[in-house]
A protein has these predicted regions:
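Anion-binding (especially nucleotide phosphate/pyrophosphate-binding) glycine-rich loop
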Residues: 2-147
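Phosphate/pyrophosphate- and phosphate-bearing ligand-binding catalytic cores of soluble enzymes
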Residues: 4-5, 10-17, 56, 151-291
Length: 291
């Protein structure tokens, strides 16, 4: 176990902000975390989990033991008549993983191409784009408790997914009546994800309910685009809207699009008929924040 002192963090955040970690451990396995938690010197230290560094803004040096997640690996766990179940280590680059699934013939994540970050961070934010959210393809995850070192797994229900939200962004709710366990699982700062599994459905069906994608379909003159075509279009669209973080530091599209009632949407459209908006299954309407 090699812990770096005063480790530079500039390479590990997409804004390329110059800062240092009091100490940094490159985590290649769950066992690495368990060893550091059991260490009498490092175990009591505050911990800071770091993936791709695309959703953080460093305001100074990090006075904690930074756990830089570098758990790699991707594989097909099993195939059923209904789906491919694939698994990836938390340290895998998200976009590279999406590309790999397509190369292997497992479509279903193409709408989430080119989102910055790691596989392990994807459930934390419940990442989403162009009509698809991570929860739509999520099977389960493995994690380790940063207080006890105990490994555990969560299914979708226990992850508490919401719009760019999950239990990994919240603390536990208050205890129930009579000192019962907390009413809501909250894992912010208490867990590190080590692996994520995805359910990619068969047969595959294209998701095209966004104007940018529909425009690409018309330009290509195809009625049933392939997953690879959608992947390529998503990459083109995103590159046209956002600079490459390696060239110009940025955090990608991390903001939330506001949701309003149909009545509120109608009132706004009356004032700005060109407003980009999308109806949601629950009856509300999502507005394009970047409009």
């Amino acid at each position: 176990m090699l812990v770096e002192k005063n480790a530079p963090l500039e390479p590990w955040n997409t804004f390329h902000i110059v800062a240092k970690a009091h100490s940094l451990l490159r985590v290649a396995s769950c066992a690495d975390v368990q060893r550091v938690l059991a260490d009498p010197d490092w175990g009591p230290c505050p911990k800071f989990v770091l993936g791709g560094g695309s959703n953080i803004v460093l305001t100074g040096d990090v006075k904690a033991l930074v756990l830089k997640v570098e758990i790699m690996g991707r594989r097909l766990l099993r195939e059923t008549e209904q789906a491919y179940i694939v698994e990836a280590g938390a340290g895998e680059n998200w976009h590279d993983f999406v590309t790999w699934t397509l190369d292997q013939g497992y479509p279903g994540l193409e709408n989430l191409a080119l989102i910055p970050g790691t596989v392990g961070a994807s459930p934390v934010q419940n990442i989403g784009a162009y009509g698809l959210e991570l929860q739509d393809r999520f099977e389960s995850l493995d994690a380790v408790d940063l207080q006890t070192g105990a490994p555990f797994s969560l299914d979708a229900a226990r992850c508490g997914f919401g719009y760019r939200d999950s239990v990994f962004k919240h603390g536990a709710s208050g205890a129930g009546p009579g000192g019962a366990p907390p009413q809501r699982l909250g894992l912010a700062g208490r867990a590190m994800i080590t692996a994520v599994r995805f359910r990619l459905p068969k047969p595959w069906k294209a998701i095209l309910g966004y104007a940018d994608l529909e425009r690409k379909v018309l330009e290509a003159g195809v009625s049933q685009p392939s997953a690879r075509q959608i992947y390529d279009w998503i990459c083109e669209i995103r590159r046209g809207k956002l600079p490459d973080p390696a060239v110009l530091g940025n955090a990608g599209s991390f903001f939330k699009n506001p949701t309003v009632s149909p009545e509120q949407c109608a009132d706004i459209i009356a004032r700005d008929p060109k407003l980009v908006h999308y109806p949601l299954p629950d009856g509300s309407v999502k507005l394009a924040a970047g409009w």
